[in-house]
Amino acid sequence: MKDKIVTFGEIMLRLSPENNARFTQCNAFEAVYGGGEANTAVSLANFDVDANYVTKLPKHINSLRQYGVGVDHIVRGGDQIGIYFLEKKTSQRPTNVIYNRAGSAFALATADDFNWDEIFDGATWFHFSGITPAISDTLAKVCLTACKKAK
């Protein structure tokens, strides 16, 4: 039997100027969906691990499903996902990142959104990063509840 690993975190939309341009120099952005916990789930799924991703999203599941990540416990709701703008470093300037995650579906998630008993059924490992409980007071409570349920 394969290990079942549950990851929990926010998937975000990264927008970066093309060709190492600065924000003020671009008319188009490269768009990539990702997030630490989602990336972990994708990597685990690539190694044939039963990887399951838990989050709250408006309507953005397909980018995970294509990698074989379990998305059965993604809660639907909210109006937006978190977005961040990444200006890539060059030899003459550092990386510049601007986050816009306030009011995202995940930032507004509450403990009542997730059925942790069902989510953790058969799970052998639970993974989330330190940023997740720091996003909002309610997410700190969600993480604490999840850890207690994970035992």
Locations of the language-model features?
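Ribokinase/PfkB-type carbohydrate-kinase core domain
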Residues: M1-V6, R65, V71, T90-K151
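Glycine-rich phosphate/adenosyl-contacting loop at the front of the ribokinase-like
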Residues: M1-Y67, D72-I74, A109-D112
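Short active-site-adjacent helix-start/loop capping segments
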Residues: L15, K59-H60, I81-Y84, R93-T95, ...
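Flexible, glycine- and charge-enriched loops at secondary-structure boundaries
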Residues: E30, F85, S136, A140
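Short beta-strand scaffold segments in enzyme catalytic cores
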Residues: V42, I83-E87
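Acidic, glycine-rich active-site loops and adjacent beta-strand->loop/helix elements
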Residues: K56-H60, G78-D79, K89, G103
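A short, structured active-site edge motif that brings together acidic residues
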Residues: H73-G82
